[in-house]
């Protein structure tokens, strides 16, 4: 009887550990399916920072947010850390060669031209700050990559300062057609 209890306990423990491994594998598979591609849309105009559009204006590629190791001293001003906004499965990133204009560039975190910081707001939208210039991207009259820059509204001494809608961007799912099931 004692041997039976020991065998039963060992099987129970072995069964629990393998089910945990199975659960971890399911989570990994879920992560592969949910690849977190975004479009960035301005709150004021709805214009997006597009990456690749097809003939009907739907986004075909989207953007991928890639975290970058942020130096400790930079975390004082960029509390959410630095990111690169990358075209998936490539070495092409959204970048600012001069800190003011947006272009697709080769991803390179050392020159800071492809580094950004997202400044969250209470609305769920964010300001997109260029690490190179310290300026934020604002709404524009033209869709695409031609956006103005301006002073970021992020003073921790004035937490209730209103951020203009032209400064705020939403991270939205891709603007693609849904498949018919």
UniProtKB/Swiss-Prot annotation:
Q: Which residues form the signal peptide?
A: 1-15
Name where it's found. Cell outer membrane
In the record, which residues receive a covalent lipid, type S-diacylglycerol cysteine?
A: 16
Q: How does it sit in the membrane?
A: Lipid-anchor
**Keyword annotations from UniProtKB, A to Z:** Cell outer membrane, Lectin, Lipoprotein, Membrane, Palmitate, Signal, Toxin, Virulence
Q: What Gene Ontology cellular component terms go with this record?
A: cell outer membrane
Covalently attached lipid (N-palmitoyl cysteine), positions: 16
Q: Which Pfam families match?
A: CDtoxinA
- Which InterPro entries does this one have? CDtoxinA/C, CDtoxinC, Ricin_B-like_lectins
The protein's matches in CDD domains, at most eight in alphabetical order, are given as:
beta-trefoil_Ricin_CdtC (cd23413)
Top-level taxon in the UniProt lineage: Bacteria
- The Ricin B-type lectin domain is annotated at 79-181
Family matches, as PROSITE patterns: PROKAR_LIPOPROTEIN, RICIN_B_LECTIN
Q: Which GO terms describe its molecular function?
A: carbohydrate binding; toxin activity
Q: Please give the chief subcellular localization of this protein.
A: membrane
UniProt miscellaneous comment:
The operon of the strain O128:H- / 9142-88 / EPEC is referred to as cdt type II (CDT-II).
Complexes and interactors: Heterotrimer of 3 subunits, CdtA, CdtB and CdtC.
What does this chain do?
A: Part of the tripartite complex that is required for the CDT activity. CdtC, along with CdtA, probably forms a heterodimeric subunit required for the delivery of CdtB.
Protein name, please? Cytolethal distending toxin subunit C
Q: Its encoding gene is what? A: cdtC
